[in-house]
Amino acid sequence: MTPVASTSALNLARSLYEAGIRNEAVLQAVANTPREQFLDAALGHKAYENTALPIGQGQTISQPYIVAKMTEIILQTKPTKVLEIGTGSGYQAAILARLVPQLFTVERIKSLQIQARQRLKRLDLHNIAFKYGDGWEGWPSKGPYDAIMVTAAASSIPDALVSQLADGGILVIPVGEIAQQLLKVTRSGDKYRSEVVEDVRFVPLINGELA
């Protein structure tokens, strides 16, 4: 099914361009993804504001600019196989699934995972594999990955995740507790290079599972 962009989604994409997002495929994915479908009806009127919003269980749907920025970084390697840590509402997965052939996504909160699966199915996005589990551990049996995106802030870079990167692959992850930075970690053989992208604010990446 070919998505039809709403005026609100198109306006959001334009505002992201003005904010510095330049990848046309990312902007098109934002324009074609109905963000209101990833929120409770009571928050639907705020869907196209450039702000993070609550989705329950102490979690949030990320600010659209950050979703687009992290996606833009991921696409630098032209990945075919991507791992997302923190499915959350499913919005970031919806953007990624329009842009990469294979997406694997892990969520530790069962109720959020169930809702996200239903939303993504309604959008006819079928190139996504879901796992209920601890994001700190990744999904090693499906790796290695060309890119890994983490949508919650880790206190440090998880060794388990960098070990699941393919050679030349990148990990995009917010790191820190009070002060957080978005990092791009690139694997080259047995070595890893870390670059700071910008200051950010995310909910914490928590160990374990929650039914």
Swiss-Prot record:
Principal subcellular localization: cytoplasm
GO terms of molecular function: protein-L-isoaspartate (D-aspartate) O-methyltransferase activity
Taxonomic superkingdom: Bacteria
CDD domains assigned: AdoMet_MTases (cd02440)
GO CC list: cytoplasm
Entry-linked SUPFAM superfamilies: S-adenosyl-L-methionine-dependent methyltransferases
GO biological process, any: protein modification process
Catalytic reaction list: [protein]-L-isoaspartate + S-adenosyl-L-methionine = [protein]-L-isoaspartate alpha-methyl ester + S-adenosyl-L-homocysteine
Keywords annotated in UniProt: Cytoplasm, Methyltransferase, S-adenosyl-L-methionine, Transferase
Disulfide bonds: none
Alphabetical list of InterPro entries matching this protein: PCMT, SAM-dependent_MTases_sf
Active site, per annotation: 62
The UniProt record lists the keyword S-adenosyl-L-methionine: yes
EC number(s) per entry: 2.1.1.77
Subcellular location: Cytoplasm
Family: Belongs to the methyltransferase superfamily. L-isoaspartyl/D-aspartyl protein methyltransferase family.
PANTHER family, per the entry: PROTEIN-L-ISOASPARTATE O-METHYLTRANSFERASE, PROTEIN-L-ISOASPARTATE(D-ASPARTATE) O-METHYLTRANSFERASE
Biological function: Catalyzes the methyl esterification of L-isoaspartyl residues in peptides and proteins that result from spontaneous decomposition of normal L-aspartyl and L-asparaginyl residues. It plays a role in the repair and/or degradation of damaged proteins.
Protein name: Protein-L-isoaspartate O-methyltransferase
Naturally occurring in which organism (per UniProt): Shewanella halifaxensis (strain HAW-EB4)
